[in-house]
């Protein structure tokens, strides 16, 4: 049976596993980017680099307002806000992530650099053309209606602004559907789009695709960190985390890409 997790399902999953994921990923809720996949760089260095790469693709100017679609516990928003001098509104479907983000980065919230709120990208509560850019790190993959999500993001972006995406995608043909189905179940992911499908969807929802770069080899080192953490845990949580790590390591058709698009 094809899995179609709702936003509530995804939120519940992150409510349960956020603490574990931030522990593995140095405070972030996304994988790292290793320029040299054979290096011994730490997770902290790699996850900060991933955020830096996404932030740079926005080509933003100081004072602009940026939307973080799937902000996790808020660390990426603070890093990008500090680096580029922008104001960031982060949204997530996990109530526990909102609480943690506000607790961790209260000073940045008070300073007006960042704000965090509970919201669904498929029904954004913002006015048309109210943002100067947006980014989505490993959030689109969870959405059961990516077209509606991208239409909503396009609606709230000003013409000429950028959307920077870092996310999983799938090769057009996957010879191991059973392993893929298990990955979907563990990670609350509906059927994944291929890179080509994502680019076409962006074009159909009001964007011009500027870049598509497959970086699957540069993110795969995350698997060894996930495996190490999984082996330190007992019970179902450790077993599930080990399955996720194994799936990511062995499913060669599982890609990961930087996608940069411009609102037309």
From Swiss-Prot:
S-adenosyl-L-methionine binds at residues 97, 142. Pfam families: Methyltransf_11 (PF08241). GO terms for biological process: methylation. One of its GO terms (molecular function) is S-adenosylmethionine-dependent methyltransferase activity. It catalyses: desmethylrestrictinol + S-adenosyl-L-methionine = restrictinol + S-adenosyl-L-homocysteine + H(+). This is O-methyltransferase resE. Its EC number is 2.1.1.-. The keyword S-adenosyl-L-methionine applies. Belongs to the methyltransferase superfamily. O-methyltransferase; part of the gene cluster that mediates the biosynthesis of the tetrahydropyranyl antifungal agent restricticin that acts as an inhibitor of CYP51 and blocks the ergosterol biosynthesis. Within the pathway, resE uses S-adenosylmethionine to methylate position C4 of desmethylrestrictinol to produce restrictinol. The highly reducing polyketide synthase resH, the short chain dehydrogenase resG, the cyclase resF, the FAD-dependent monooxygenase resA and the enoylreductase resD are required to generate the first stable intermediate desmethylrestrictinol. Pathway: Antifungal biosynthesis. Keywords: Methyltransferase, S-adenosyl-L-methionine, Transferase. The gene is resE. InterPro entries: Erg6_SMT_methyltransf (IPR050447), MeTfrase_dom (IPR020803), Methyltransf_11 (IPR013216), SAM-dependent_MTases_sf (IPR029063). It is an enzyme of class 2 (transferase). It comes from Aspergillus sclerotiorum. It comes from the Eukaryota.
């Amino acid at each position: 049976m094809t899995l179609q997790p709702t936003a509530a399902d995804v939120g519940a999953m992150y409510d349960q596993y956020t603490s574990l994921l931030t522990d593995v990923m140095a405070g972030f809720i996304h994988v790292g980017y290793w320029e040299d996949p054979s290096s011994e760089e730490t997770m902290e260095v790699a996850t900060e680099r991933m955020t830096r790469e996404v932030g740079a693709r926005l080509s933003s100017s100081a004072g602009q307002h940026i939307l973080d679609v799937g902000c996790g516990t808020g660390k990426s928003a603070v890093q990008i806000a500090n680096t580029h001098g922008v104001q960031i509104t982060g949204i997530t479907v996990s109530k526990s992530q909102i609480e943690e983000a506000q607790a961790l980065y209260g000073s940045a919230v008070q300073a007006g650099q960042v704000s965090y709120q509970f919201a669904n990208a498929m029904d954004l509560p913002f006015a048309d053309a109210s943002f100067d850019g947006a980014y989505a790190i490993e959030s689109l993959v969870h959405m059961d209606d990516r077209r509606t999500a991208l239409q909503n993001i396009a609606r709230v972006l000003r013409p000429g602004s950028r959307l920077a995406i870092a996310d999983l995608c799938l090769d057009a043909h996957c010879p191991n559907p059973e392993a893929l189905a298990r990955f979907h179940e563990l990670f609350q992911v509906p059927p994944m789009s291929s890179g080509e499908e994502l680019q076409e969807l962006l074009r159909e929802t009001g964007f011009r695709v500027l870049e598509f770069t497959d970086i699957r080899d540069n993110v795969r080192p995350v698997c060894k960190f996930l495996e190490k953490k999984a082996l330190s845990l007992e019970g179902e949580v450790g077993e599930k985390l080990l399955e996720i790590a194994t799936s990511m390591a062995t499913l060669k058709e599982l890609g990961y890409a930087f996608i940069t698009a411009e609102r037309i």
